[in-house]
Amino acid sequence: MASSSPDTTTLPFLQFPPEVRLSIYQYLIPDLPIRNFSLLRDRSKTIHLRHDGSRCCPALLRANHQIYAEVIQEWYGSTSYEVVLDTKYILFCGKVIPPYVPLPSTIQWVQSMRLCLSIQGTPRHIHSQSTLEHLLGFQDRLTTLAAALSDKGYRKLGRLQIDIGVNIPLLLSLSKTPSELLELLNWNLLPLRENVRDVADVRWELQEQSYGIQSEEFQRSYAGMKSIMCAFLQDMRLDMLERPDG
């Protein structure tokens, strides 16, 4: 924190008992799920992040070392935070974080996270240099996020909801066989599976996208691939879950 922060002895607020201060903080922090696109779209408007319609007070996090230490867990533990992982950026708290840029340390304080990503092709499917650069940027964002959430000594993550976008025609064009599908899933998800462990609650959901009326053959092909994908994701979930003592 900046050296200009007021000294704790000059703040009468800190003379209140800790439980009173915590009660006050509850009226000044978000309690609605934090979604990135609404924050990005409505920058010119007042964003309401509380059920009661009142404003939050992020200035609390800059007020004082002690207040920061008390508020930070409440601020990032009171609601669910969405993280969007794209080929060009990560979105977190309405901020666009491009590849090869460190993530904000506050992401480790998030207790409930909704992670949104879409299945991408692997580099061997790509012939365009610019598309390859985007894919490598996606891989950097993925591994950086996984690393940030891997340290059980610092992270506070207790619930992880993974929403996985699947472009069905693209998926079938990239994976003709079960082994190709598993290669594709590993490329997109292995950093999370290997590094983010011992989370109390892990869930996943497929967000399927298709276009037009599909033939029965198309539907059968996808049904077979979907069963493999669901088995992979269930195994991944079990790997990431917290293991009971003993």
Each predicted region: which residue ranges?
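Low-complexity, intrinsically disordered/propeptide-like segments
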Residues: E19, D31, K152, L184, ...
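A cross-taxonomic marker for long C-terminal extensions/tails that follow the last structured domain
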Residues: L206-G246
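N-terminal Skp1-binding subsegment of the F-box domain
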Residues: S4-I47, H51, P58-Q66
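Generic detector of low-complexity/intrinsically disordered segments
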Residues: F16, R41, C93, L117-I119, ...
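C-terminal-biased hydrophobic
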Residues: R50-A223
